[in-house]
């Protein structure tokens, strides 16, 4: 499908609610030594800090045929020619991703702000650039953007980092003036901010004191809040803390997003459907909107190559696994 080039004002669409939208996560974390960001092969590199045959963090190689700007890597294609990758820092990379969203019917993205990177000058500069480019391309193609704070790696006391950052973003992008920033996602009449990583039992360095401060702080500023929680948040088992404060904090928020990645595969998903339906009942009874996660499958063999045990991902099966989840969740949310 050919896409005509139209003036930005004609492309702009106002996003007033998350309801009915299909949103993707957008990490924007890939770097190259020559992209100007001084982060080396960030997220491409293996555990030893190098990106080369035998040391990498990725299992899938990107098809870069449509990218305007690419970078030669230490890898070779089967024909002996150099293999190229993209950088998330480049405006042309982000623009292509939003063009694809328009082409394939994806409504927008949650652009992640990793709290741990906000304290690292090069990391902050990189993700500031990614967000700038995303806001520009979202407006160009009529797509939605929502900021998501990923708390992974955060320490106690870093809640101030989150609240200070969103204050700066609100001024920079006019988040509370929807006519001036129509591409920013609103929900329940307010700009939406996502906070991912509340209630997990994997030994994090922050707790409910910090997450409550973030949620209450965002609410006091006038935001709606989406909270990302473990898959088993309702029963508080398996991947979830057994602490009543989790449910209390979920009830403070506008939207609940459980993390289902890796919690089932194509064979076990049919049995997981009841879990989602029970989640939805709880959310409705407590006046919280519910957003289930669908994922296409993945492999992380190289990411976990340092571990002795064989690491198995979730087979994609040519899209059948993804379609199974989408069909169920779209049908149940009509």
Please identify what each model-predicted range represents.
Residues 1-10:
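Bacterial Sec-dependent N-terminal signal peptides
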